[in-house]
Amino acid sequence: MRIPAEAIIADDKLTMYLLAQRQWDDKSGFLRRAGFTLDNWNDLRLAIRELSNSVEAVNDGGNEYGTFYRIDGSLIGPVETLAVTLIWMRRSVDQRFYFVTLKPRKE
């Protein structure tokens, strides 16, 4: 299945989690390699949407909150392309899709 175009990617997920330098589970350094920073955070949103629109999402289990979907693919950044896994959730309460996270893909 494809993640719908109206799926939600919260601003805070990008600016306060993925692109913010953190002591634990830091992803900002990985994303910086591709040219994503807090200065161009919306470019990251667009790249996530582009990947999600071009690759089938695979059911990755679920819990009481919803069903998780995984997308493995190439995230195209301003200076480099990264192999990533995107995680989305279709929430049980409203059936809407929400972006959860991305992580480096082990090849």
Describe the predicted segments one by one.
Residues 1-70:
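Compact soluble domain cores
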